């Protein structure tokens, strides 16, 4: 089924508990096929960690979920809405930029690099999107932004510019910024890979709090196996553009079925 192909059943979180639904997702860059028919469902409040070797397609799949990369075929929905496309006369066609921006507002994303605005303070970074996109009043945005900075342990850094923050602090501001849009789904693309080892723990602690205290629906691409074992409801193994195994952490790490999964885990555990 192509991105412009036949229509499937519309899925909404209120009907079946699914926040994210992907079916048969393919993506190529030139002649290189990076995603080879990815299908994955994530339920409301579920935490899914995606692991696998570099080049297996993990980050590309994450970027396809919020249409930072256009899929070649398949279907991706968040909260029952097609991402990047719309239904028109019985066909699926690419949506307008305005509608895509609205769809993305339901999806928070934290990147490897923090991507903070260097000319804005921590608080200004957090409140920018709610004010401009959600049209929240500045007074309300500031109150909510201060609460989010406090939640990630940075209440005292509200007026500090990114250049004066450590890498771990910048990533925590990035998490607060993503949460400020009140997304239905949070995507984390190897959020600790650019950090110095001594500050990785502070970012992982914030992510665990999101999982256990806030019940945030999360998809996390990570090489942090300890986090995946402790915080995930389900671990997914990708290899060569395909999902080859998935399951609860206890089964996945202690009794993997696939030989490729066993090989991968033996090298990193």
Predicted feature descriptions by range:
Residues 2, 246, 250-269:
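C-terminal boundary and immediately downstream tail of ABC-type ATPase nucleotide-binding domains
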Residues 17-249:
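ABC family nucleotide-binding domain
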Residues 1-26:
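ABC-family P-loop ATPase nucleotide-binding domain
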């Amino acid at each position: 089924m192509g991105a412009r192909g036949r229509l499937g059943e519309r899925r909404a979180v209120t009907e079946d508990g699914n926040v994210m639904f992907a079916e048969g997702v393919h993506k190529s860059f030139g002649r290189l096929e990076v995603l080879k028919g990815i299908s994955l469902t994530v339920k409301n409040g579920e935490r899914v960690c995606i692991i696998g070797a570099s080049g297996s397609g993990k980050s590309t799949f994450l970027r396809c979920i919020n249409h930072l990369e256009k899929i070649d075929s398949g279907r991706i929905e968040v909260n029952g809405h097609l991402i990047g496309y719309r239904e028109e006369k019985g066909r699926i066609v690419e949506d307008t930029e305005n509608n895509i921006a609205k769809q993305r507002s339901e999806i928070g994303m934290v990147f490897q690099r923090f991507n903070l605005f260097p000319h804005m303070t921590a608080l200004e970074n957090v409140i920018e999107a709610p004010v401009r996109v959600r049209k929240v009043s500045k007074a309300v945005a500031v109150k909510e932004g201060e609460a989010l900075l406090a939640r990630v342990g940075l209440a005292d850094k509200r007026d500090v510019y990114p250049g004066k923050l450590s890498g771990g602090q910048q990533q925590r501001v990035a998490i607060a910024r993503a949460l400020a849009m009140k997304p239905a789904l949070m995507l984390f693309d190897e959020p600790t890979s650019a950090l110095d080892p001594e500050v990785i723990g502070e970012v992982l602690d914030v992510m665990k709090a999101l999982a256990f205290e806030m019940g945030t629906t999360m998809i996390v691409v990570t090489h942090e196996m300890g986090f995946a074992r402790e915080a995930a409801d389900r671990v997914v193994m990708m290899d060569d553009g395909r999902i080859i195994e998935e399951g609860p952490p206890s089964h996945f790490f202690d009794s993997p079925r696939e030989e490729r999964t066993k090989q991968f885990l033996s090298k990193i555990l």
